[in-house]
Amino acid sequence: MHNLEMLPDMIRAAKEMGSPIIIQTSIDTAKYIGYNVIVAVVKELANSMLVDVALHLDHAKDFDAIKDAIDAGYSSVMFDGSSLPFKENIEKTRLVVEFAHARGVSVEGELGTIGGTEEGVSVSEEDKEYTRPADAVTFVRETGVDVLAVGIGTNHGQFKSKTNVKIPLLKEIHSVVDVPLVIHGGTGVKEED
């Protein structure tokens, strides 16, 4: 979500569908509106409409933003250490998991990179890193993440060309880890994928 005006319709749609909903904010949106304001509005709407809502902070690269979100009442955070060396990504993600889990908050980690531009960070097609299944096993085991975002060829942002999503790679990763997988960057993904 990018503004408070979106929230009532999002939660109302979930109610009409009889479904829980995950509402995700970027760090920029959360800082602009205020973590506490977002949490208060989401809680009020969720309680008044009787809808289960998970409030998720997306692509946090520093611990302070994660702490701010958790302290305000977010129920889920993503630590994006995908640009870090593998071992450093594991170490920093593990610290986030320890902090978050002690407060009942779930954590998404990222392994591999997503192409395109988001939050001012650009990754070219040539620089995309695909998630290796063996690394995914190690990462999940050593960090304790609840969900894992994987690099399988998708892109953030608006693209005119189609992306080349590696579905066999996704299936292989899925077969070797025991946590749900998250795919970021659906822009340009072929309808059949």
Describe every region a protein language model picked out.
Residues H2-D28, N36-D52, A60-I183, V189-D193:
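Alpha/beta enzyme core
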Residues Y32:
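Cofactor-binding active-site loop characterized by glycine-rich and histidine/acidic residues
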